[in-house]
Amino acid sequence: MKTIVLIACVKEKQSNPCKAIDLYQGKDFTNWVSYSKKINADKIYILSGKHGLLNPDEIIEPYDFNLNNANKEYKKKWSDLVLFKLSKETNLKKDNYILLCNDIYAENLLSQIKNYSFPFKIK
C-alpha cells in the first residue's frame, strides 16, 4: 500500500509556463507540498480544475479557472478523467490517499477511492 497525496491547485500562479509543482504559488499550496514531503508520500499529484490530474513535473501554462465555479456536468467529467488517470498509476482500492483539497474537488472521487483522509479542513 502506497501513500498518495492529492493537492488542489490554487489561484496564485507564476506568469510563465513551468512545472506544475512550481506554477502554483499560494502559501497553502507550498505548505501542502511541504507536508507531503514531510510524511514521505510515495507520490504527489496536483488536482487542477482545468487540467485534471497533474504530475508535479508536467509543464503547463498559467490559467484562470476554478473548479468550485464549474457546473455539475463539468465536475463529473473532470472527476472521471482524474479517476481514470489515477487508476493507471495507483491502486484505487488499496493505496492510502491523503486529500489536500476541499469537498468540491473530492466529492466525485470518493466513490472510487477506498482509503482516504482529509488531514486539514480546506475551504
Feature map (PLM): residue ranges:
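Peripheral peptide segments
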Residues: 1-123
